[in-house]
């Protein structure tokens, strides 16, 4: 299974985040799954790639040309796919993924997982969309989705397939039910 993970090229200031990223990467590698991610060697992106590779897993990076020109790509990847721009990168990462996980991240992470959430809610994508809600990071987004339902702008049926989790065990449970 290809697990597309969205996360930042920064590490953030919460040590638990780095640990959770490394834990997921190790599990992906050890479980025989494959990682699809943004391709960078920096920050949390670099951490998940290293953890997956060190655990024997395959890692596909998807990076736009301008990042490659800046020499930000991870050198040890199983495969590096270079795209024209960020839009093409998002499309490719979705096409490659069987499941989608977003760690806490910045505006780029939010943009990427918002597109996945939209496709899942429209049933254009039949795959789990998982937000890793470490230390309540995504509570605001969770409340916004609930408010959409409350105001009649969405429905529980539309939001099926969107999950908020606290740890790796919950991710494993979702994947076990979905596949």
Predicted feature locations:
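Short beta->alpha connector loops at strand-helix junctions that form conserved
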Residues: 39, 63, 83-84, 103-105, ...
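Short, well-ordered alpha-helical segments in soluble proteins
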Residues: 104, 114-124, 145, 149-152, ...
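Active-site/ligand-binding-proximal alpha/beta "capping" segment
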Residues: 90-122, 130
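A cross-family phosphate/adenosyl-ligand binding-site feature
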Residues: 1-96, 135-169, 173-179
